[in-house]
Amino acid sequence: LCANTGAALHLVKPLGFDLDKRSVRRAGLDYRWMAAVQVHDDLAACRAALVRAGAGRWWAIETGGTRRYDEARYAPGDVLLFGSEGRGLPTAVVDEIRLAFGADAVLEIPMREGNRSLNLSNAVTLVTYEAWRQNGFGVTR
């Protein structure tokens, strides 16, 4: 996904998977060399790296968000923040995003009543492509 869209991927430990060559290939990340991937020890280190890189607005994608992901207006450099597949984002992180960027910076993906959530990779793909679409796709081929 990152190689195809040009998005940078920032992972925060602890990871729920291995980044060794065999695991990465099995997960479909065998062209990781084409993507910008950084692993951070904690969210504070990730945040500092993103600030140094000139990150824009932060968006928290979370069940129970204030508005739908397709209602947001994304800009180049924005940060899409997803939690772990099982637990989502910590409440303190969601509160921090609300405080810094407003309640409407917490987004949700609509789904049918009674369903909990999409898996993480599908959610990331959906929101990333919407942000990319809004910014003209930037396709170079």
Language-model segments: residues:
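Post-transcriptional modification and biogenesis factors for structured RNAs
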Residues: 1-141
